[in-house]
Regions:
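Acidic, low-complexity, intrinsically disordered interaction modules
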Residues: 6-60
Length: 61
């Protein structure tokens, strides 16, 4: 279960959404200009289940 969510933006303009869970893990989504990167970090600090998807918002379809 999600305990809380933190949203922030770094100095380069990359937006982050971090979802913290009651088991000590967190799920992070990074919104870069041309791709989105999702991954889970366990309570031990291991990075799991990385997903890299292109960002199609900037394309004219």
């Amino acid at each position: 279960m999600i305990i809380w969510t933190w949203r922030w933006k770094d100095d380069k303009g990359v937006r982050f959404v971090e979802r913290f869970y009651d088991d000590g893990s967190k799920y992070v989504t990074e919104y870069h200009p041309d791709f989105i990167w999702d991954y889970r970090i366990t309570k031990d600090g291991k990075r799991l289940a990385e997903i890299h998807t292109p960002n199609y918002d900037h394309l004219d379809n």
